[in-house]
């Protein structure tokens, strides 16, 4: 958000012009600039409202302040706010809190309702037809209009293959919400609305595959969630060669890997990884230590240590006493991998990445056994980010780029925001 009460109290508010510029640049100009301005102007009060609603249920929602160091390769804007779950991580907690608040205001909720089609009188949307849990058709009449928040289409294999084959290939695990089938988007298209011209997904580089597996061309992988995957440890291709600056926004790592054999790579680290991770000072949900202002991360390092132990038990993460043994267990050419590690250790010792330009404090050595590694191919698919094009009042737009009366679109199924990549550093 921009302009929340917490940001202002922390003296860490974000310049709205910078935020809008950032969004538009990240989408290669596909963002509707005036819509981004609406977000910049209204997001602060929205976050304030959400903070108060969660507080009614005893849930803390806090602003995140992160380090900004000279020489950083990527600009970071402290727009993030996150739920402080404590020991009980469950998205259901926040959903229950919002539902409780809404029902107190008179909201009626009906469950297991599937979108079928919109109904129109002339050009105006007047209601919709849906199916209930008994597979019965239900008509909803709407005198003021219909607001659709049906989610994206990341759970619709046909739509994903048709619109985002590159995202399918870069998916290791699909964490789509159950309703993300594209029903709302299709209903809008049938009613005369238009969709974004470019199609993209939110995919984080946190997928693990077994040491004897590789990514498949044109197909999604079947792996496990490896949350530490976004940490900028040394990453090598199947030839044992370093091929990237490992500190890049989540999906950019997957884009870089797309030009490597079987779009598969290995992430490797040693026994001192907790102190390395703290020094790396990553941002957003990849962060594993408290933020500068004390806001807790989504998952603390202690939780990740347990997750890694489980992945090791399941045969995803391998452990070795020597670098040569690590190469064997990951199926890498021993001589090439050993030379790569020696070179990387040399760069880290000198504090300058002359090969790929990574920040000095995000370099680390592989020097203290035991050593660990994991194969990665594709990531953690959360949702699609393209959708129905909307105006600044959230009206769906028709083929003449005019608002369709009575039809509003919000959430993951709305468009004109993103293209190509998710701006995870905002």
Q: Predicted segments — roles?
A:
Residues 1-21, 337:
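N-terminal glycine-rich dinucleotide-binding loop that anchors FAD/FMN and/or NAD(P) in oxidoreductases
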Residues 80-85, 175, 219-227, 257-258, ...:
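Short Gly/Pro-enriched turn/cap motifs at secondary-structure boundaries
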Residues 80-82, 158-162, 418-424:
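Short acidic, glycine/proline-rich loop/turn micro-motifs
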Residues 185-187, 191-329:
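An anion/pyrophosphate-binding glycine-rich loop and adjacent beta-alpha core
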Residues 38-137, 157-158, 208-210, 348-368:
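Conserved redox-cofactor binding core of oxidoreductases
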Residues 117, 322-325, 336-421:
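A glycine-rich dinucleotide-binding beta-alpha-beta segment and adjacent secondary-structure elements
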Residues 13-75, 318, 322-333:
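Rossmann-like flavin
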Residues 133-136, 140-211:
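Glycine-rich loop(s) and the adjacent beta-strand/alpha-helix scaffold that form part
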């Amino acid at each position: 958000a921009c302009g929340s009460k917490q940001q202002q109290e922390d003296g860490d508010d974000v310049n709205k012009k910078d935020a809008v510029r950032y969004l538009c640049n990240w989408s290669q100009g596909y963002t509707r600039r005036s819509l981004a301005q609406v977000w910049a102007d209204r997001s602060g009060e929205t976050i304030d409202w959400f903070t108060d609603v969660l507080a009614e249920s005893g849930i803390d929602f806090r602003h995140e302040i992160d380090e900004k160091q000279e020489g950083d390769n990527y600009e970071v804007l402290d727009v993030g706010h996150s739920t402080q779950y404590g020991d009980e991580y469950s998205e259901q907690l926040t959903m229950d809190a919002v539902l409780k608040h809404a029902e107190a205001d008179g909201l009626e909720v009906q469950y297991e309702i599937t979108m079928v089609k919109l109904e129109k009188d002339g050009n105006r949307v007047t209601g919709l037809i849906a199916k209930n849990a008994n597979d019965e058709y239900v008509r909803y009449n709407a005198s003021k209009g219909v607001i659709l928040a049906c989610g994206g289409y990341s759970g619709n294999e046909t739509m994903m293959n048709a619109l985002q084959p590159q995202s399918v290939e870069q998916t290791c695990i699909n964490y789509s919400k159950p309703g993300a089938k594209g029903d709302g988007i299709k209903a809008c298209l049938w009613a005369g609305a238009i969709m974004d011209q470019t199609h993209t997904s939110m995919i984080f580089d946190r997928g693990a595959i077994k040491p004897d597996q590789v990514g498949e061309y044109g197909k999604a992988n079947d792996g496990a969630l490896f949350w530490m995957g976004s940490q900028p440890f040394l990453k090598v291709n199947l030839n044992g060669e370093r091929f990237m600056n490992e500190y890049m926004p989540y999906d950019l790592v997957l884009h870089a890997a797309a030009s490597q054999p079987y779009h598969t790579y290995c992430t490797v680290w040693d026994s001192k990884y907790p102190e390395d991770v703290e020094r790396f000072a990553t941002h957003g949900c990849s962060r594993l230590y408290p933020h500068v202002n004390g806001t807790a991360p989504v998952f603390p390092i202690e939780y990740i240590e347990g997750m890694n132990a489980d992945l090791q038990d399941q045969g995803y993460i391998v452990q070795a006493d020597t670098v040569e043994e690590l190469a064997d267990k990951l199926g890498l050419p021993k001589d090439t991998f050993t030379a790569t590690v020696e070179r990387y250790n040399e760069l880290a010792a000198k504090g300058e990445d002359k090969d790929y330009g990574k920040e000095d404090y995000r370099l680390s050595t592989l020097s203290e056994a035991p050593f660990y590694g994991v194969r990665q191919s594709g990531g953690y698919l959360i949702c699609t980010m393209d959708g129905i094009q909307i105006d600044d009042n959230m009206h769906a737009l028709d083929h003449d780029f005019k608002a369709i009366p009575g039809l509003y679109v919000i959430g993951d199924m709305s468009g004109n925001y993103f293209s190509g990549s998710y701006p995870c550093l905002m």
